Each structure stands twice: as structure tokens, then as C-alpha cells.
């Protein structure tokens, strides 16, 4: 996948109508935005376009309305908060059809530097199917397309891919530019030693990532629920831990592949276990990697935490995707905390691959210590798998 794409700075925007696909998929509670990170993240691109005298038309999805106009998933609260963040009015075009009379009127009345926000693109069932009619409607409002929503770059939808077919120029905003730089450099030209840390519940979610990263890394660290399938493949007892029986053979193959490639594959040497999947179950630390009958693994143990932290501290590039244990339970969060602390201390390029790891790092207050926290869980995973992301492919090459 070519990463050398036009950015907002490579295109003429003054006096032009610029349709910007943002990621405003923010959590709402009773119509109030509870986490506005994504709105703040979109500011540099929007402010640049406003300052350059573009007519800025913003669009995004919110939640999963599944092709129906659901009032609780309206972008109205987003328009209000964006107006405050930008310190200028963001006109909200409240059309259930997204590109309706309100949108057309608002766009027709725009002056250079004005900002309009369209309604939730997923109010239209065509959006997620990338159907041409809706792509054309979106494109009819604008002269140029800018995509700044990395979180949906792995989806071929009207507002991420289809619209680019009907406009002459398509560029990326600052958010996507940053994602491509950090994720791209890490995967294509990492400063070594390059360490990748994979956690989370399932091996099956990460099969292609493991396979692709074994071609690139010096050390691969595995934790979280997926580690128990690997421990079983090594011949350890795993009690009643989460395991994917149909992936045990695959785990063996990956261990062989790591050996053949000279990649260090680090797996837990001890575990923190409990009798129930419950925050209040008594935590017990095992002597070694074996998990006794009647217990389930819920976190990596202290020896493993130290082993993983050492590998991270000596790295020059670290990519992390997925927690080391059941992070939401305080008794089983220590492994995830240890890895986050080691990354914060490392003299390295440190990249968090979105999703749960990003939430964990931000909750622990280490967010500002990381080089880059990806804004897209699914998109960053597919990037690490070596897949082409349709939303990036659709942009104009430099």
C-alpha cells in the first residue's frame, strides 16, 4: 500500500468547498459527550482549512443507526461542542437524508472559512454498502475531499471511499498523515530492536497480525487471554482458562516460525489466576506457567511482567495492541500497568494500536508519554496485518 498520499497542505483549498470525513463517533450519555478526544483530534485539520479560507463541510458517522434516522444518534451535540472548540459557529444541517434541503441551503450560503456539519452518514443505509447514489450526493456538495477518519479507513463506505471517485482531488488530514507516518515507519522501517506486544482475548482476532509481525520484529510478546492457547501448545496445564482448541496447532506453527526467523517469542512464565471470572475472585499467583485445575488465568504474573518490561525497556520501537489481563478488574490489571509503565520509560518510539490498550494507557495517565496513540483499533490492526486500507488507497498519490 502506497503511503505517499497528498495531504491537506498539498492541495489548493482557498474558496473551495472541502468535504472532510472526520471521526466524530464519540460516546454520548443523555445527549452529552462523555469523551471528546476525537473532536479535539480533528481540530488541527479543521482549523487549517478554516484559516486557509476553505468552505469546510464536515461529515461523520455516530454509532450504528443501521440506515434509520435515530434521534439519539444525531450529530447535533457534536455541532454544539465543535462550535465551542473552534470558537466559531458550526452550522448543523439536520437532514435525516444527510444531503437534503438544509444541507444544500447551508452549503449554498457558505462564505470562505465557514463550517457546516452534516447529519450522521449512517442514517443512510447506502453508506455502509458504498452505494454510488449516496457517494454522488455527498460529492455534489463539494470540490475537494479530505479524509481524516483513520478509525474507519479500513471500511469501504460512501463517505470514506465512494465519494473520492466523484471528486478530482482526495487528500488526507493531519490525523491520518500522523497515523501513516508512525504506523508506516514502525512496520516498514523500524529502528531496532523492534518489539511488538499483543494481548487481548482471542488468537483468532490476531492470526494475521502475528503472522505478519513475525516477518518484521525482533521480539514478539504475547499476553492476555490469547496466551493460554500458546501455553497449551507448549504443553502446560491451563485449568479452565480461555482457550481456542482449534488454534493450538496454529500456535505451535507460530512458535516454530519464530524460531526459524530468529525472533524471540516471549510467553508468560507465571500467571495470576482466579476461580471465577469476577472482580472479587481471590487472585492467586502461580509458581510457573502451569495453571491448576479449577482456576483460570486472568493476568500475567510478576515474573512475566518483569520479563516483558525488560524487553520493552531495551527496545527502540514498540507497538502494543491488547491488554495483558482483565484490565477492568483492579486485581488483574497489574500486568497491563507494568507494560504501560515500561513503555512510558522506554527510550523508544512507542505506538499504541487503538482500542483497549489506548483506553488503558489513557486511564493510567501515560497517554502523553507515548509517541503515538492510534485513533483506530480495527484500522490499526489491519495495518499491522499488512492489509491495504480502502480509505487510504482512495486518496490521491503525491
Curated annotation (Swiss-Prot):
Pathway assignment: Carbohydrate degradation; glycolysis; pyruvate from D-glyceraldehyde 3-phosphate: step 2/5
Predominant localisation class: cytoplasm
Similarity field: Belongs to the phosphoglycerate kinase family.
UniProt: substrate binding residues: 23-25, 38, 61-64, 122, 155
Gene Ontology annotations of biological process type: gluconeogenesis; glycolytic process
Binding site for ATP: 206, 297, 328, 354-357
Keyword Lipoprotein: no
Organism domain of life: Bacteria
GO molecular function, one term: phosphoglycerate kinase activity
Record keywords: ATP-binding, Cytoplasm, Glycolysis, Kinase, Nucleotide-binding, Transferase
Subcellular location(s) per record: Cytoplasm
Name of the molecule in the record: Phosphoglycerate kinase
Recorded catalytic activity of this chain's protein: (2R)-3-phosphoglycerate + ATP = (2R)-3-phospho-glyceroyl phosphate + ADP
Subunit structure: Monomer.
Enzyme Commission code: 2.7.2.3
Cited InterPro entries: Phosphoglycerate_kinase, Phosphoglycerate_kinase_CS, Phosphoglycerate_kinase_N, Phosphoglycerate_kinase_sf
